[in-house]
């Protein structure tokens, strides 16, 4: 009994002492050690002592942990639907050194009336009803795949209107804000004016707040993702009188809007992504072409336009012709994946535009999860693929 006691850890105001080995660690070094540990380990530490709990739940520590996590190699996060279940998987890209990989299962969301086209915003994902669904008082869910926990936001007074939603992060205050827009007057085809914009602050808010001043614009396709870079939320919009795509920017901290004009025209379904640190629109062209429009100067509405012919790459052959463009990764590669998965494996393609090379990675194991309805589905749909998934301690 005495031997067991000697191995216990004693925590004081200035030292942590491991008596059995006579090791003393200054208390101010403990946060530096803890923020290098995985989320699962920190979750177990919450039951060790009140001192550990106070450190891990401290807001400054959580912000520091997130910053430290963002410096590590970031993974792709897949949202895959099957049998009415949405499952989240992460995949760490090993580069050209690997030809196959098994993604890590994160969590599932068994909600039939939820759509997830939103990316991971500093580790959190916001999902809710599709914009085509009329709900009197819709509710959005914010999930943390790292902790496998979610919170339900307060009801939105939508007045029986369809809604669009986006989430951004303010790196200065460490606040997450969810932006919700009502679908207003029908303008043309699938275009509706945005009206009654509301904001919810994740840490502080108990209710939604109205945003009074915003430029008139039309909401775009519901499966067009948003993007948050350096405290600015971007989402694809359209001008009310033209066919040109535009990008709306929303400063998460100041809650100011700015419309970036000059995007591609036509009935496209572009993917908003990050390319070399800048927001960009990614969309397929004809004859095996991939188009990339990068916002070079938002204030001047300046874009650079690139088009890549991938027909010469050896991997653009059957059965990969049906792959869809999803996003870009940190290496500047364009990520392509199939819309539907009907077998135990599928292939993800990575196209490097500067090198004009294509590599493939065989993805295994997504059908191995024994989840009711999920493993019984005859096929699974890849709803979204995004880069930039990081570990986050919120909701731990």
UniProtKB/Swiss-Prot annotation:
Pfam families in UniProt: F-box, FBA_3
F-box domain sequence ranges: 19-65
Domain of life: Eukaryota
PANTHER family recorded: BNAA05G37150D PROTEIN-RELATED, F-BOX ASSOCIATED UBIQUITINATION EFFECTOR FAMILY PROTEIN
The protein's name: F-box protein At2g21930
Annotated source species: Arabidopsis thaliana (Mouse-ear cress)
């Amino acid at each position: 009994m005495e031997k067991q006691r000697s191995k216990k850890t004693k925590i004081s105001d200035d030292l942590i002492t491991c008596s059995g080995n006579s090791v003393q660690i200054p208390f101010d070094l403990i946060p530096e050690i803890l923020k290098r540990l995985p989320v699962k380990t920190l979750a177990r530490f919450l039951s060790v002592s009140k001192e550990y709990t106070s450190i891990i739940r401290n807001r400054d520590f959580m912000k520091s942990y997130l910053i430290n996590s963002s410096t590590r190699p970031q993974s792709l996060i897949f949202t895959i639907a099957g049998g009415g279940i949405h499952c989240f998987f992460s995949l760490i890209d090993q580069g050209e050194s690997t030809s196959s990989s098994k993604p890590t299962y994160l969590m599932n969301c068994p909600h039939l009336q939820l759509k997830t086209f939103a990316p991971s915003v500093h580790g959190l994902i916001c999902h809710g009803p599709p914009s085509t669904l009329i709900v009197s008082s819709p509710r959005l869910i914010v999930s943390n795949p790292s902790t496998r926990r979610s919170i339900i936001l307060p009801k939105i007074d939508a007045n029986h209107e369809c809604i669009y939603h986006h989430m951004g992060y303010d790196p200065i205050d460490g606040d997450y804000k969810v932006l919700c827009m009502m679908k207003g007057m029908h303008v043309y085809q699938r275009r509706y004016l945005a009206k009654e914009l509301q904001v919810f602050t994740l840490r502080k808010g108990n209710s939604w707040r109205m945003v009074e001043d915003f430029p008139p614009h039309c909401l775009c396709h519901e499966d067009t993702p948003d993007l948050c870079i350096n405290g600015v939320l971007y989402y694809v919009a359209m001008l009310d009188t033209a066919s040109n795509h535009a990008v709306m920017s929303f400063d998460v901290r100041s809650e100011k809007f700015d419309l970036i004009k000059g995007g591609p025209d036509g009935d496209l379904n572009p993917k908003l992504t990050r390319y070399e640190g800048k927001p960009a629109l990614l969309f397929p062209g004809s004859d095996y072409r991939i188009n990339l429009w990068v916002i070079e100067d938002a204030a001047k509405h300046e874009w650079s336009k690139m088009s890549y012919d991938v027909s010469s790459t050896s991997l653009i052959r059957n059965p990969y012709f049906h792959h869809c463009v999803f996003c870009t990764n940190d290496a500047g590669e364009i990520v392509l994946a199939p819309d539907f998965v009907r077998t135990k494996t599928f292939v993800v393609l990575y196209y490097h535009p500067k090198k004009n090379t294509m590599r493939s990675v065989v993805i295994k194991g997504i059908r191995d999860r024994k989840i009711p309805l999920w493993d019984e589905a005859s096929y699974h749909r890849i709803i979204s693929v995004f880069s930039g998934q990081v570990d986050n301690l919120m909701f731990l």
